[in-house]
Amino acid sequence: MANHHDHDKPLRSALDPISSPYFSSLNGTLSIAKEVLIGPFQGDHRRSESARILSDLAPSLMQPRFLNAASSSQQSLSKSSHPGAPYPLLRLPTNLPFNKSSRPTASSLAILEAVDNLASLSLGDVSHPQNGQNSPSLIRGFKATIPSSELAKQRRRMVRGGIVDEDLGGKIGLKKLGDRARGLLTEKGEDEEDGELGVGRHAVKKRRKKRESRRFTEGRHLEGKLRLEDLAKQADEIGQDKENLHVRQSLIQSEIAEVGAKIDALEDIRRHLEASLLHLQEEDLELDDELEGVQELMASPAIKAAAGAKSLPLSSSGAGISNKSSRRRKGPAFLPSEHDELPSGVAFMTLNGHTAPITALDFDEPYGMLVTAGQDDVVKVWDLCDGEEIGQLRGHRGTVKALQVEDTLCLTGGADGNVRLWDLRMVEDYEERLHTQLAELARQDPLERIAEQRAHEEDGEHAEQDDELPDGTLQDPQPGDGSPCVRTLEGHSKSVTSLYYEDGCLVTGSSDKTIRQWDVATGQCVLTMDILWAISNPPPPPSSVPPQRPPRLSHRSSTSFGSNTYEDILPSPGASLVGMSGAALLGAATGQNFAVPTPPYADGTWEMYQDFVGGVQFWGYALASGSGDGGVRMWDMRTGQAHRTLIGHTAPVTCLQFDEQYIVTGSLDRTVRIWDLRMGSVSEVHKYEYPVTALQFDSRKVVACTGENGVEVYNRTTHAHSRLVVNGHTKPAEKMRFIDKYLVSGGRDGCAKVWAM
């Protein structure tokens, strides 16, 4: 075991045979270097895999022809840089001053300083870093998996089988027995089989004696048939086979880990591809909306007049689109180029002017004119380009709870039960005229003004005033006197809480529990629909009702927790959330004065909710309404009858919108429900922590005010939820309206926020 002793000797003693005869001769140096390099790998002790590889490869690489080729190649490469360096093949890496032309470097000096420490190290076995399991080398894995690695096992089995055959007196024909047991035909005849199987009486007695002999000896028949050297060799082979088995296990485990890593990588790739596919679906929907917007422009009279006699290709559904309400237009908004530079999800403009929560708002187009109404009984008109107030709409007595803006026409419904139509182009001039009148009144003697008022009263010329100027003087903005109010519609006996206008037709909902249809051109009410009559006379259920599955609970707000099933919210968010039972809610809905307490908002405030009709919208002859009893009714405007009632909300419905396939509703029961009009059932339920007060949707998203400071945005394609909060409201958002990527919201803090989505 001399080599084993050389394996553990210090590095200095191992380098001495190389450094001392370095200039003697090339052959002597090569032989000594070979002995030093290969000596540690020739011991009989167990060595690491890298040492085995070097031990296997070094004898082949150190042959004379390889050494001569390497020496000549190295000399040819180093002639230009080191012409005088002897034996460059074995030149030490420490840049020792064998070559006077080489200049010392910082690295070489550091190595020279550490020579004593490095030389004192022993030449131990090369150890692999432990990473849970040793990874076998390529050569070791090859040796463990080649077919020849199984030869030793087969040889041992053959040796043991030969001994047993000799002990049993020859083969006993087990293969034939197996074939016959399976019913297979053999090539030999029955006589030959009987002879081979030894069916004769003599053979049977002989095998019986052999079995008795083996039973009595208890395996001692192997003694003397295998030598110690053979047994030791078999033990070494078994150890080698076990090592090969461990190597194969390690290889399989490595492959399993690689397959797992590949599966994870593929899953990650799949997720990215699915996200890309969803993004493409959103782009497809956006292109559909853009195409419809282009077709709408092509159908407009101005474009047709400019085109002259040219016939433009229009779809069959393109006729009449130009007159539809802005709430159903799907085309892209014409936004300035600077809008794309705004960060998304940030409120970039704040409009302060109301001293109470905002109750309604609407605008005609992005960066156009905005109209807001608040509980301070003020209706303001804003310029969205610079955020300046243009003026006010004076005329309603009380709070305006519903309004809509279509181009330059604005319709407002107030607590006085009236609906007023305004021309927004006249607001600025009217404001200037009012300021002029105020200046004249300020210069007039107060006694003269009082005398004039008494004279008007005595003559009966003084009429009931509808608004009050800042100095306390009443001003009556009647149509035709230069006021922006162009028409007043009277008919409701209580507050107008919702309205919808399209193509000269207006539908209003009121707390008097009726829905009225108006002809705006004549100012006449053409149809009245009684909700109480619809409640007491519900439409008959359809003859065949398809089985309804529970709707999928798609979302809980950020503060929600618990079950994600529908059953856990079905009984709970009903009227109990507003402090009333179902019977009490029905009683409030059918009573004379409707009023229920709202659930607390995020800031802890609450109020009495008195808007019996929370939302209305029509399309053609189809009308949808949401009322205080939690019902969503579909009306036929030709007959004035409700032909379907969607039951699901368990608190008053505050807002709704519908298109060709879906109707989306929000309620005080803290849910937003998406109904499938074809099935007449709920397809999705989105539950929040606070009451839903406003919503709007298009083909890609649903935007809602859910009683929190932020505005909730639900992506209908990716089913992802986000919230607009940056530079947002300081109190819960109450109302909102968006067109394309431009959104305006109004909150209980009395301010309006303009967002880039």
Curated annotation (Swiss-Prot):
Q: Which organism is it from?
A: Cryptococcus neoformans var. neoformans serotype D (strain JEC21 / ATCC MYA-565)
Superkingdom, according to UniProt?
A: Eukaryota
Q: Per its UniProt record, what InterPro entries does this chain match?
A: G-protein_beta_WD-40_rep, WD40/YVTN_repeat-like_dom_sf, WD40_repeat_CS, WD40_repeat_dom_sf, WD40_rpt
Basic and acidic residues bias (residue ranges): 454-463
SUPFAM superfamilies on file: WD40 repeat-like
Say where the protein is mainly found.
mitochondrion
Instruction: State what protein this is by name.
Output: Mitochondrial division protein 1
Question: Which Pfam family, an example, fits this chain?
Answer: WD40
Q: Which PANTHER family match?
A: WD REPEAT DOMAIN 5B (PTHR22847:SF637), WD40 REPEAT PROTEIN (PTHR22847)
Family to which the UniProt record says this protein belongs: Belongs to the WD repeat MDV1/CAF4 family.
Q: Which residues form a coiled coil?
A: 225-300
Membrane topology term: Peripheral membrane protein
- GO CC terms on record? mitochondrial outer membrane; nucleus; transferase complex
- Which of UniProt's keywords are assigned here? Coiled coil, Membrane, Mitochondrion, Mitochondrion outer membrane, Repeat, WD repeat
Where is it located?
A: Mitochondrion outer membrane
Compositionally biased residues, Low complexity: 71-81, 312-324
Q: Where is this region: Disordered?
A: 69-88, 312-336, 454-489, 538-564
Q: What does this protein do?
A: Involved in mitochondrial fission. Acts as an adapter protein required to form mitochondrial fission complexes. Formation of these complexes is required to promote constriction and fission of the mitochondrial compartment at a late step in mitochondrial division.
